[in-house]
Regions:
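Bacterial N-terminal signal peptides that target proteins for export
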Residues: 1-9
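Beta-strand-connecting loop/turn residues
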Residues: 11, 37, 48, 80-82, ...
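Sec-dependent signal peptide cleavage junction
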Residues: 17-32
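Extracellular beta-sheet/turn segments enriched in Thr/Pro/Gly and aliphatic residues
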Residues: 30-32, 113-123
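Structural beta-strand segments of beta-rich domains
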Residues: 35-41
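Aromatic-rich carbohydrate-binding modules that target alpha-glucans
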Residues: 46-92, 105-112
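Exposed beta-strand face motif in extracellular beta-rich ectodomains
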Residues: 93-98
Length: 123
């Protein structure tokens, strides 16, 4: 009887490891979070790196780095894609234009796009 019990326990353990591990490994999709007064945008992309270039009529460059701009921060994933965030902290002016890029300046979504504060852009 003890051998039978040990066999059943071993089978249950193996089955749970086989079928439950992949389910528990799935992380919940990232949900964007912003603070009230922040200037920020999100980008959902299949690439593992993203940069941003932002400007308006008065300010030629909102980024601290030269082209292709600032590296965006990886926040999590959604539907298997990476979600990046960029936050502007150097002032209260808001950009009107934005370009997202990857791998040394390859433009995403055709290049120039309208900047929307707290906007969520998808590649």
């Amino acid at each position: 009887m003890q051998k039978f019990y040990t066999l059943i326990c071993t089978l249950v353990l193996l089955l749970s490891m086989t079928f439950m591990a992949p389910v528990s490994a799935l992380a919940a999709d990232y949900t964007p979070v912003v603070t009230e007064n922040e200037i920020s945008v999100f980008l959902e992309t299949s690439y593992d790196n993203a940069k941003i270039w932002a400007w308006n009529d008065k300010v030629k460059q909102f980024t601290t780095a030269e082209w292709p701009g600032d590296a965006m921060t990886l926040m999590g994933t959604k539907d298997g894609k990476n979600v990046f965030k960029w936050t502007y902290t150097a002032g209260t002016e808001i950009p009107t234009g934005v370009i997202f890029s990857h791998d040394g300046g390859q433009k995403l979504n055709g290049g120039n796009q309208e900047f929307k504060n707290h906007g969520y852009y998808v590649e």
